Amino acid sequence: MDKTKITVVTIGHMPAEFNKGKVTSWNSSVFEITGEIESYTLTKDSDGSAWEFTDSSLEEVLPDTFQGDFLAAIVNVPLELNWYTRRLHNNRLVFTFHEIKEILIHSNIPLENIIYRLIYAYTLFYKRSGNKIQMTGEHTNFAHDETRGCLFDMNGIKTDIIYSCHNPIIYPNCIEKLKQEKVSNEVISKVQKEITRI
């Protein structure tokens, strides 16, 4: 089984508590982070009515070319609709520490845990979507509304994110969906084993 290759970058100022080295040194048999986590400057101002950065604005800031199968960009600014992650064109996604950082720190959860959780969730999403990251506007059934401590929790109430950032699971219904969408039993089993380290 080939590992999914992921390019991780940061855009703009990062929280002092975030350790990029921990993310690059994470050992997985399912994915591989390509190279080091490079840092880019946030060259635009917010363009949304609530001081958020819209998808179209971030499309212009994120690198267009990268080595991995998909690109995960980490920012520390508000995103469109106040979500904490958005899926963009060309197999790119963005995650923000905005509001999430304080929630994790308050619960004594390392900031890196949300990155591990999202990398596993998006790796499975990439595989079940035919090796692509579908855009935010595309209907995917990627996440569920109810908080279950699962990789695929929506976390519409952001404070619920703590339940999937410490010893997360893959909920049984989500496992069945992954199998129906042709993710191998071996990949699912490896992810289940590895996420116990989060």
Please provide the spans of the model-predicted regions.
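N-terminal pre-first-transmembrane soluble regions of secretory-pathway and organelle membrane proteins
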Residues: M1-N76, Q134, I162
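Active-site-adjacent loop/helix micro-motif of nuclease/hydrolase catalytic cores
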Residues: F53, L81-Y84, L104-H106
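Hydrophobic transmembrane alpha-helix bundles
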Residues: L71-E80, S107-R117, P172-N173
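Catalytic zinc-binding patch centered on the HExxH motif and its immediate surroundings
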Residues: P78-N90
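A short, glycine/acidic-enriched catalytic loop
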Residues: H89-E99
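Active-site recognition of the HExxH zinc-binding catalytic motif
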Residues: F97-E138
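Metalloprotease/metallohydrolase-associated module, dominated by Zn2+-dependent proteases
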Residues: N131-I198
